């Protein structure tokens, strides 16, 4: 992908040179105030004559994150990984803007839910997808990348490969890499068992060349951190989690399933 310098009003940055899209529509969406808000940004998907675009605006002083996502997306692509194609990136003072083309494919959670249907064929396909997930995360780390927030919604499954979304906190370097395994594993997912979670870790450990002792140490560490995150996020007392055990804590449809707990409270 080739990029050229771009400026409009007080915006300065780069745009894709050979892709048709409406810059004015994207800027209007960025300034419109709509979309999903997160801690550092606001995201909005918009329909255009050229397809779906994702507009992510970063209020001051977090505009540097837009440039980081742009740079990391290109670095990932150069290393053989799939990431959304940036159409437009810019700064306005200390605010930032990132516009990407829709990555296509299927959300990881949607793919797993689809493969949770009964039947030996579906079960085999689900297990294969989970093994591929562990192997791909290992490949990411081996290439020197650590994703900033590798939760399932930030992964797409497209044409037999994973696409890494939201790369504004992705960085190079090994320290903290195993945290990605905690981010992936802390979600309660329909149709995913404790054995399925272990399958991801085994594939990861195998691809990283870990021996049995190091594999067991990694698994125990990831399990402890997942339990701690569940307790912190969902306000589960540590003593309650310890009594219930990991399987019950992470079982879809179980007493600690956040979806069921929310429904009961409603």
Positions of the model-derived regions?
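Conserved protein kinase catalytic core
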Residues: 62, 107, 155, 172-173
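Conserved metal-phosphate-binding beta-hairpin within the catalytic cores
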Residues: 157-163
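Short alpha-helical scaffold element within the canonical Hanks-type protein kinase domain
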Residues: 126-130
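Hydrophobic residue at the +6 position relative to the catalytic HRD Asp in the kinase catalytic loop
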Residues: 150-157
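Conserved ATP-binding subdomain of kinase catalytic cores across diverse folds
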Residues: 18-113, 120-121, 132-143, 147, ...
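Short, glycine/acidic-enriched loop or turn micro-motifs at the edges of active sites
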Residues: 104, 152, 169
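C-lobe/activation-segment region of protein kinase-like
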Residues: 163-228
């Amino acid at each position: 992908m080739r990029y050229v310098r771009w400026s409009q009003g007080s915006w300065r940055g780069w745009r894709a040179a050979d892709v048709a899209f409406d810059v004015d529509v994207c800027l209007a969406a960025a300034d419109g105030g709509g979309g999903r808000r997160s801690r550092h940004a606001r995201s909005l998907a918009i329909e255009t004559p050229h397809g779906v675009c994702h507009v992510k605006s970063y209020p001051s002083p977090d505009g540097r994150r837009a440039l980081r996502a742009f740079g990391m997306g290109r670095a990932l692509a150069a290393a053989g990984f799939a990431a959304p194609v940036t159409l437009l990136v810019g700064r306005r003072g200390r605010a930032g803007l990132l516009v990407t083309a829709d990555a296509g494919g299927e959300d990881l959670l949607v793919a797993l839910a689809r493969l949770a249907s009964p039947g030996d064929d579906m079960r085999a396909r689900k297990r294969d997808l989970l093994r591929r997930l562990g192997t791909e995360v290992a490949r990411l780390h081996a290439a020197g990348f650590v994703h900033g927030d590798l939760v399932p919604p930030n992964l797409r499954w497209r044409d037999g490969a994973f696409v890494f979304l939201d790369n504004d906190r992705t960085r190079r370097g090994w320290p903290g890499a195993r945290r990605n395994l905690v981010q992936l594993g802390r979600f309660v997912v329909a149709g995913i068992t404790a054995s399925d979670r272990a399958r991801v870790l085994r594939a990861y450990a195998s691809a990283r060349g870990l021996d049995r002792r190091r594999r067991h140490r990694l698994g125990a560490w990831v399990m402890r951190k997942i339990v701690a995150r569940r307790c912190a996020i969902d306000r589960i007392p540590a003593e309650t989690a310890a009594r219930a055990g990991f399987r019950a804590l992470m079982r879809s449809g179980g007493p600690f399933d956040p979806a069921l707990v929310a429904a009961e409270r409603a």
